[in-house]
Amino acid sequence: MNGIALLIGLGPLLGWGLFPTIASKIGGKPVNQIIGTTFGTFIFALVYNLVQGIALPSGAALIWSIISGIGWASAQILTFHSFTLVGSSRAMPITTAFQLLGTSLWGVFALGDWPSTSDKLVGFLALALIILGAWMTTWSEHKTDENSAKLRKAVIILLVGEIGYWAYSAAPQAAKIDGSKAFLPQAIGMCLVAICYAVYLKVKEPSQRSALAQGVSYKQIISGFFFAFAALTYLISAQPNMNGLATGFILSQTSVVLATLTGIWFLHEKKTKKEMVVTLIGLAIIIGAATMTVIV
């Protein structure tokens, strides 16, 4: 691995690692966060396509790519809602674990990954470790009924959101479209969800000011740039002449460590010393298990 490939591979670490913390720090409701995030992603993707001279795909490739973006934005709204319940430092390891589980199971049952019995044994052991690691990051030394109820609600929300994240990764595969060409139409799908969600909330509560007219929604464009930067650098990192799919994937998953720690440090999502130790061990288990899923 050369230096340039490593730097590009660390792009998702910075982008996806800082994205949830920045979105939470800027503030606003989930609708404000999804508007800014998707608009920022669209701007980033549009500039990238113009600079690279990439034409918008057509036909099934366009439709599947837009569906991919719709899936991501729908899931991300639910993830933002989970932040309001348990904070990003607890929500991010859970959603990362669910995405790893979803991606791995899709690969096994739909794409024929882990063909041998030994591969399956190692792979499913890794999935069990991912679940263990995610549970450890949510462990609380001083439990209360209220906090336990919030955590259960957040887990259910994130589990439902996994359907959208699965569509985000699986839909482009259905069209067999290159990731860089799917980038802009994915952003279009994301923006459609954000606008529809904002309009729905305005119709539901006419007396409330539309999120599309609130300044905080457009401040969130900054967080969208971080997400888009991570998504683009991951596409580049996963190319065979860079880090390759397996190494690129492992490097990208390290973002959960940064997302969790910055949530604790900068958003003051406090943990006791014991909780911090257990959280760090849980994060290490998730990263180690993610590595296992791509080497079998």
Curated annotation (Swiss-Prot):
Q: Which UniProt keywords apply?
A: Cell membrane, Membrane, Sugar transport, Transmembrane, Transmembrane helix, Transport
Superkingdom as given in the UniProt entry: Bacteria
Membrane topology type, per the record? Multi-pass membrane protein
One annotated GO molecular function: carbohydrate transmembrane transporter activity
Q: Where in the cell is it found?
A: Cell membrane
Q: What is its main location?
A: membrane
- Give TM regions: 2-24, 34-51, 58-80, 90-112, 121-139, 182-201, 221-240, 245-267, 276-295
**A GO CC term attached to the entry:** plasma membrane
What does this protein do, in the record's words? Could be involved in the uptake of ribose.
What family does the entry list? Answer: Belongs to the GRP transporter (TC 2.A.7.5) family.
This one is known as Putative ribose uptake protein RbsU
Q: Source species, please? A: Lactobacillus johnsonii (strain CNCM I-12250 / La1 / NCC 533)
